[in-house]
UniProtKB/Swiss-Prot annotation:
Residues 89-105, 118-150, 167-187, 194-226, 231-257, 260-295 are annotated as: Triple-helical region. InterPro entries: Col_cuticle_N, Collagen. Residues 231-242 have a biased composition (Low complexity). Residues 157-168, 202-220, 279-288 have a biased composition (Pro residues). Collagen polypeptide chains are complexed within the cuticle by disulfide bonds and other types of covalent cross-links. Pfam families: Col_cuticle_N, Collagen. Nematode cuticles are composed largely of collagen-like proteins. The cuticle functions both as an exoskeleton and as a barrier to protect the worm from its environment. Residues 186-196 have a biased composition (Basic and acidic residues). Belongs to the cuticular collagen family. Keywords: Collagen, Cuticle, Disulfide bond, Repeat. Residues 86-102, 258-278 have a biased composition (Gly residues). This is Cuticle collagen 36.
Amino acid sequence: MKIDKEDDQQQQMRRVAFFAVAVSTAAVISSIVTLPMIYSYVQSFQSHLIMETEFCKTRARDMWVEMQVLHKSGVTRSRRDAGYKEGSGSGGSGSGGYGGPTGAGADIGPTCCPCQQGPAGPPGPAGDTGPNGNDGHHGAPGVPGKEGSILSSALPPSEPCIICPPGPQGAVGQQGPKGPPGPKGKSQERAADGKNGEPGMIGPPGPPGGVGEPGPPGPAGQPGRVIQVNGAAGPAGPRGVKGPPGPKGLPGIAGLTEIGGQGPPGDAGGPGPVGGQGPPGPQGPQGPPGDEGSCDHCPEPRTPPGY
C-alpha cells in the first residue's frame, strides 16, 4: 500500500499539536513546583497570624485585668497644672494636626471598645523643675550710631542756676523686681540630689517564665533496710506441676477362672484404603450451540492518510 506525503495542513496541525503539548507540560511542571511553595507560604502566614492574634488577646486580657484592679483600688490621678491644653467636651486640635488631650470636662459616654481598653485618662501631675539651660552665645556687635550734633534749645533762656544746699534724705523706696538669673558657675562639684518621688503602684504579675534547666543530681540516699514484719497468711498459691509417676506397685491378686460376659463394643475403626477406579460413565447430552464469531479481536486495517 502506497502512503502519500503529508500536505501543508497536516504539517501545520502537527506543529500546533507539538506546541500545545509543550505548553501543557510546562504548565504542569510549574504547577507542581508552585503549589507546594504557595501552600507553605499560606501555612506560615496562617501560623504567624494565629500567634499575633493570641498575643493580642493576651495583652487585651492583661490590660482589662489591670483596669479592673485600678478601678477597685480607687486610685485617683490629679491633672497637671501646666504643659497641657485645657480639656473640652469635643477635644480641640493642637499644633501639628494632632488632637489635644481630653480634660476633666470631656463628656465620655459609656462606649464598648473591641480591644477592651478605655479612653485616655486625665493628665498626670506636673513634673519636677528642670535644670537651668546653658548660656547663649554672644551676639554680633551693633552698627555704629550716627554722629551727634548740637541743636539750639527751643526753650526761652532761663535764669542762672543757683547752687542750693543738698536737701534731707528721702524715704526708702520699694524693693525692685528680681533680676535675671546669673551665668552658670564654674564649680566642678556635683549638686545635691533631689528628693525621691513617691513609690509607684505595684504592677500586674508578669507572664510565667519558661521551664528551667534540670538541677544537679541530689546526694545519694541511705541504703535500704529490711524490716521483718509478720503479716497474715496469704492466699493459697497456684497448683504445682504434675509430678513424675510413682514406683511400680505390688502384684495384684490372681483373677477368677470363670468366663465373663460379652464386653461392650469397641471403638470405631480407621478409614479403609482408597478404592479402585470405576468404569466410565455413559455419554452426556449434546450442549447448546455457541455464539457467532466476530472480528473484535482483529487489528484495524492501515489506510493511507486522508482515506
